[in-house]
Amino acid sequence: MILVLRALGVGDLATGVPALRALRAAYPGEELALVAPRWLAPLVDLVGGVDRQVHADGLGHLGWSGPSPELAVNLHGRGPQSHRMLAALRPGRLLAFANPEAGAVDGPPWRADEHEVDRWCRMLAWYGTPADRSDLALRRPDPGPLPVGVTVVHPGAKATRRRWPVPRFAAVARELAGRGHRVVVTGSPGERDLAAAVARAAGLPADAVLAGATDVGELAALVAHARLVVCGDTGVGHLATAYATASVLLFGPVAPAHWGPPPDRPWHEALWAGPHPSADGPAVHPALAALGVPDVLAAVGRVETAAARRAVPVQASGPPPLATRR
């Protein structure tokens, strides 16, 4: 059995998909279990190839009662905490970045200046398991009662310094609605007031606010069938990449070279005005604050044109189900 640790969020899971697929291909007859937060379960189902999810919210003791895994893979971080969490299970072999403090001395070195997708592909390649960094697509879920063809504006982010100002998001939403877009505003339950403020300032109807009304699987379905996504450096942007939905992503303080969409896909555009010196406190980071409404609207025009010109549609169904992969 293969146990993989990636106990993080939406964007973290999405950027780990190529590595997960590589492990599935390398060990087709083995059970593959993924350690991830329970609330990510609907999204884990869309990855394909994962037999079982082990629920864990971050690092710490893992309630594991089964036999020691034959192989444990740390796709979570550079250690030492994540290394020790897996080592405590006494796996037959541990694949991880080198971290002498945690007793891991045979792995590749960690590089801070590296795209998150490439980081885990490189680690597996070091151990002889090649991964395709472009293998980012997720299975496209049925939208059910969710609206299709909408423009998703997602103003939230975990850190307030990564949130573009409400008046600017509202100005973009107002302009796009005026151009004929059906705009919806998404977010977590804790971001409902933020989403409502954007919608109100943009003159959108109350039912345009979907923040807190969707779980992560429904959010994925909404993005999969959307016309456009406008958001910051968040998991929603990674969902847009996974479904080839046209997107404009606003970055800061982290550069898109570390977390952005593939640069060879012009229907996704990452805007970044950095580098700028980091500022303390919750204020919007200068690299993000430097982006104006005209910058975003111009990028919208470019990504929609690129999406319309795309000659070969991205496969709609995503990876085949597990039953056909083994």
Question: Model-found features: residue ranges?
Answer:
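Catalytic machinery of carbohydrate-active enzymes
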Residues: M1-R326
